[in-house]
Amino acid sequence: MKHYLWSMALATVLLSSCSSTSKLYSWYNYEPVSYAVAKNPTPERIETLKKVYERLINEPKGLRKMPPPGICAEYGYLLYKQGQQERGLRLLEREIELYPESTFFIGNLIKQLKK
């Protein structure tokens, strides 16, 4: 009987840990849109991706209530390459503010872009 109770308790703990539905970040429809751009980067798809970036940055949801990691950097780099250098650099710097662990990588990227 004791063995049965321990088995049930263990099963309950394991199953309850698998049922977590809360997410740290909200990705909206980032994945299919970014895949479509990677597959065929048409101007229309890039504009759609830019709208997704704006929504991810300006309307963050999820438990952390902040943009997902890498989004500010990706969007900043895209804007920089499209001629919006000042805005792009601001977003790259925001990535560092939000995720200090990205300082080395994003800092080097900023240095390369400013050359």
Please name every model-derived segment.
Residues 23-27, 66:
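Residue signature of alpha-solenoid helical repeat architecture, marking inter-repeat boundaries
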Residues 14-17:
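C-terminal motif of bacterial Sec signal peptides marking the signal peptidase cleavage site
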Residues 19-21:
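Bacterial signal peptide processing site
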Residues 41-54:
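Helix-turn-helix repeat elements of alpha-solenoid scaffolds
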Residues 74-75:
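Structural register within alpha-helical repeat arrays
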Residues 103-115:
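TPR/TPR-like alpha-solenoid helical repeat scaffolds
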